[in-house]
Amino acid sequence: MKDWQFATRTQAMDSLAVHEMLKMSGLPGIISFAGGLPSPESFPVEAFNAAYEKVMREHPRNALQYSSSEGYEPLRQWVAQSLPWEVSPEHVLLTTGSQQALDLIGKVLIDEGSRIAVQTPSYVGALQAFSAYQPVVYSIPNDPESGLLQLSDLEENQLRYAARFFYLLSNFQNPSGQSLPAEFREQLAKTCDALGLPVV
């Protein structure tokens, strides 16, 4: 068998973490919250079938053709209009899922050795996506009592390390399941804005 030469950066990637989580979720009697897999009973199968049939009946050729790399223009317009703040459709990028979005963020914001800040604990799929670009990761831990981030830790670390961005999950955080209260989100946004720290 041919011994293929892979890029050096792949040596830092841990492809087994997500694979092992998803493998465990297929075992009988296991209800796994780790992989973020929704219950199959919750899928709106009938609604998807109806939408698919309508599109294939009314716009079959457009539906099967490639779209722009930014995503389907009418959908980007709809997303822009649906957001609670003013945004142009030109600033909306559609991806095939969160993993593609995380990979693109890593691709455009991380150089080898650049620093990123992450909420701890954090979503292993994001850490895996970012690791391909070989950043130096530092943690902003949740307070064990309140479950909230310590903004003073974020400020101190940003002033010391100058991270490219701060990654966290504000809704249904994986793995904790916690959602940040609205008033804390406002404090976090103000803190990051003052630090010039983009939030992912």
Question: Residue ranges of each PLM-predicted region?
Answer:
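A composition-driven signal for long, intrinsically disordered, charge-rich low-complexity tracts
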Residues: 6-7, 19, 114, 193
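Residue-level marker for buried hydrophobic side chains located in beta-strands
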Residues: 198-200
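Conserved core of the PLP fold type I
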Residues: 62-196
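N-terminal small-domain helix-loop-helix segment of the aminotransferase-like
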Residues: 11-97, 104
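Generic N-terminal amphipathic, Lys/Arg-enriched alpha-helix
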Residues: 1-9
